[in-house]
Amino acid sequence: MARFVVVPLLVLLSLFGLEAIQHPPKIQVYSRYPADNGKPNFLNCYVSGFHPSDIEVDLLKNGKKIEKVEHSDLSFSKDWSFYLLYYTEFTPNEKDEYACRVSHVTFSTPKTVKWDRNM
């Protein structure tokens, strides 16, 4: 009889344990093609390895949110951490600065990662 109570209790405790685990996202900002001023390209922000799944991602141009942004569906890895890809079309030039800003429960303030055109 005790076995019938203990097993469901252990299952419930393990599920609650999954919610308690928090992993900060890894943020990678890159362009689809090598940067070439004046030529259309895609700006990508790949956010991976995070848990829980609640996350806010913004692509920025000169510190301002880019409105026309698309993203992949939220997916998870074998370790149950999540990943997403945010992307938008853009045309790089010498004066504009691009970045990805991420808000997640593991960050006390949003984290911003700049696009390095030489990567």
UniProtKB/Swiss-Prot annotation:
Keywords: Disulfide bond, Immunity, Immunoglobulin domain, MHC I, Secreted, Signal. Disulfide bonds join C45-C100. One of its GO terms (biological process) is immune response. Gene3D superfamilies: Immunoglobulins (2.60.40.10). It comes from the Eukaryota. Pfam families: C1-set (PF07654). It is found in: Secreted. The keyword Disulfide bond applies. SMART domains: IGc1. InterPro entries: B2Microglobulin (IPR015707), Ig-like_dom (IPR007110), Ig-like_dom_sf (IPR036179), Ig-like_fold (IPR013783), Ig/MHC_CS (IPR003006), Ig_C1-set (IPR003597), MHC/Immunoglobulin (IPR050160). GO terms for cellular component: extracellular region; MHC class I protein complex. Its main location: secreted. Residues 25-114 form the Ig-like C1-type domain. Residues 1-20 form the signal peptide. Belongs to the beta-2-microglobulin family. Heterodimer of an alpha chain and a beta chain. Beta-2-microglobulin is the beta-chain of major histocompatibility complex class I molecules. Component of the class I major histocompatibility complex (MHC). Involved in the presentation of peptide antigens to the immune system. PANTHER family: BETA-2-MICROGLOBULIN, MHC CLASS II-RELATED. This is Beta-2-microglobulin. The lineage of its organism: Eukaryota, Metazoa, Chordata, Craniata, Vertebrata.
